[in-house]
Curated annotation (Swiss-Prot):
This is Putative zinc metalloproteinase in scaA 5'region. InterPro entries: MetalloPept_cat_dom_sf, Peptidase_M13, Peptidase_M13_C, Peptidase_M13_dom_2, Peptidase_M13_N. One of its GO terms (molecular function) is metal ion binding. GO terms for biological process: protein processing. It comes from Streptococcus gordonii (strain Challis / ATCC 35105 / BCRC 15272 / CH1 / DL1 / V288). Residues 1-564 form the Peptidase M13 domain. Gene3D superfamilies: Collagenase (Catalytic Domain) (3.40.390.10), Neutral endopeptidase , domain2 (1.10.1380.10). It comes from the Bacteria.
Length: 564
């Protein structure tokens, strides 16, 4: 038996690890995944009954989910249709004759859910988090991070070869010739290599405060003179914006050589491949499995989800908040909700007490940290109501699965653009109630705990207080800690980017977070090396979360370190 003081992780988890099995359709296992699988089993068995017409809820939104699920689960019909439902969608992109034609259709394609490689979106402003503004992001890359593109990276050649083979197999299902496939993928790889020179690395993207680069509209337009940006955004948001936030500044400074007629062949190839890939979840099962081959290679997942799981997860996508609300109604009692709400209050009080006893912060900074704690908004279990747009998600069983998917996506796309220049909706949840997860949003200064994570072993009304504090208490404290991690520390109580620290205190904070970076940097993690800078925000939240949860547990009369 391993002693705690020799190897804490092995002492706690060693026996479990000897018998733990990673499911073939998942890349990892553990406490979170065990609970997620329980919920998955519940949802699969429940929706099986719904598909058979047994116990379908008296709820129009869930009835539309069932109709959509029925189309997704009808693999015989999907097999018989083959790629035909997607042909017009793909052909429209293949038949684009020029960069000018593409540029003139960007807005229409964007609103219709067609590929544009036009990475713009609407999100809260960093400087005034109460209002939604326009952001210019950058494209993704084939490899997991820009660092993989270094010539001496040991996985570069192997992963690119796996990606290419996966796309070759996929495109062959869509009647592309070998010559067309080779030409298409050569061009996509060429363009991807260009993207990799300019887009941010994961480490760069992890430093939120360094991502804020506002551009006046005329200055930004000058970066891409061949794109009719004013026309595009007049269609998307109803007018020309006055500014855009550009986190991917390096990419956009080079974008004039990407969004140009001279580069049309490569852009066109990328658009065609994107169009094909966009259709793959909705066609035959063979195509679905082929489309996921590269991602499974990246994550080390031996096999694809089976048909039953794939149909459920595809169907729940547009309706996930409604399904989460149903789950919460079944599994999360009002008593449990009230108890968890009180635990959040308790944990915030623990943080205030820890701040009061802090010996390296000045009173000025401590007081501002307490102000931030006082206005953190906790959301427990489930949202009070569903977004209005859910009532407009109507499924037509006379249309194909792909046609319905397109119709449903139009509603969410229109909503995302309608948020521009509008007040931020603080009641909007970023994940459904049946997801085993939790989060802190620094721009809204809120913490969210879906009903799914408020289940055993993380939480149970009938567990000891120590077990609950060691489970959900640590999760709650982890999320609160994110308000003061290397990113959260840059945002004030209103969620705006604002330095509320004294210079001396922030320097002391930086010195301490650097120690966390140094502690984790280069450690072995399942055959790879930890990047201390990339993981520091999570490590800080873990350390702070466990410390605060333990302090809270010790205040209870029935405290048990072992149960914690």
């Amino acid at each position: 038996m391993t002693r705690l003081q020799d190897d804490f992780y092995d002492a706690i988890n060693g026996e479990w690890a000897k018998t733990a099995v990673i499911p073939d359709d998942k890349p990892v296992t553990g406490g979170f995944m065990d609970l997620a699988e329980e919920i998955e089993d519940l949802m699969l068995s429940t929706t099986d009954k719904w598909l058979a017409g047994d116990g379908v809820p008296e709820d129009a939104i869930l009835q539309n989910f069932v109709a959509y699920h029925r189309l997704a689960a009808d693999y015989d019909k999907r097999e018989a249709a083959g790629t035909e439902p997607a042909r017009a969608y793909i052909d429209e992109i293949r038949n684009l004759a020029s960069f000018e034609e593409y540029a003139s259709k960007i807005a229409d394609f964007e609103l219709a859910g067609k590929p544009t490689y036009f990475p713009f979106g609407v999100a809260p402003d960093f400087m005034d988090a109460r209002i939604n503004v326009l952001w210019a992001d950058g494209p993704g890359t084939i490899l997991p991070d820009t660092t993989y593109y270094a010539e001496d990276h040991p996985q570069k050649a192997d992963l690119l070869a796996k990606w290419r083979k996966a796309q070759e197999d996929l495109l062959a299902k869509f009647d592309f010739t070998e010559e067309e496939i080779k030409d298409l993928l050569d061009k996509v790889l060429d363009l991807d290599a260009v993207f990799a020179q300019y887009v941010l690395s994961n480490e760069e993207s992890s430093e939120y405060a360094k991502l804020y680069h506002p551009y006046k509209w005329d200055d930004f337009k000058a970066l891409v003179p061949e794109l009719p940006l004013t026309d595009i955004f007049t269609k998307l948001i109803g007018q020309e914006p006055d500014q855009v936030i550009v986190p991917e500044e390096r990419f956009w400074k080079a974008a004039k050589d990407i969004y140009t007629a001279a580069n049309w062949d490569k852009l066109h190839a990328l658009l065609i491949l994107s169009a094909v890939r966009n259709t793959t979840p909705y066609l035959t099962d063979d195509i679905r499995v082929l489309a996921g081959a590269y991602q499974r290679a990246l994550s080390g997942t031996p096999q694809a989800q089976d048909k039953k799981k794939a149909a459920y997860y595809l169907a729940q996508g547009p309706f996930n908040q409604a399904i989460g609300l149903w789950y919460a109604g079944q599994k999360f009692s009002p008593e449990a909700k009230a108890d968890v709400e009180q635990k959040v209050v308790t944990m915030i009080e623990v943080y205030k007490n820890r701040l009061a006893q802090n010996d390296w912060l000045t009173p000025e900074t401590r007081d501002k940290a307490i102000v931030k704690l006082n206005v953190i908004k906790p959301y427990i279990g489930y949202p009070d109501e569903l977004p209005e747009r859910y009532s407009r998600k109507i499924v037509d069983e006379n249309l194909t699965l792909f046609e319905n998917a397109q119709k449903l996506s139009l509603i969410d796309i229109a909503y995302s653009w309608s948020k521009w220049n509008q007040p931020v909706d603080y009641k909007e949840w970023g994940m459904p109630a049946h997801m085993v997860n939790a989060y802190y949003n620094p721009q809204k200064n809120l913490i969210v705990f879906p009903a799914a994570i408020l289940q055993a072993p993380f939480y149970d009304l009938h567990q000891s207080s120590s077990a609950n504090y060691g489970g959900i208490g640590a999760v709650i404290a982890h999320e609160i800690s994110h308000a003061f991690d290397t990113n959260g520390a840059s945002f004030d109580e209103n969620g705006s980017l604002n330095n509320w620290w004294t210079e001396h205190d922030y320097q002391a904070f930086t010195e301490r977070t650097q120690k966390v970076i140094d502690q984790f940097e280069g450690q072995d993690s399942y055959g790879a090396k930890v990047n201390g800078k990339l993981t520091v925000s999570e490590n800080v939240a873990d350390l702070g979360g466990i410390a605060a949860a333990l302090e809270a547990a010790k205040k209870e009369a029935d405290f048990s370190a072992e149960e914690f």
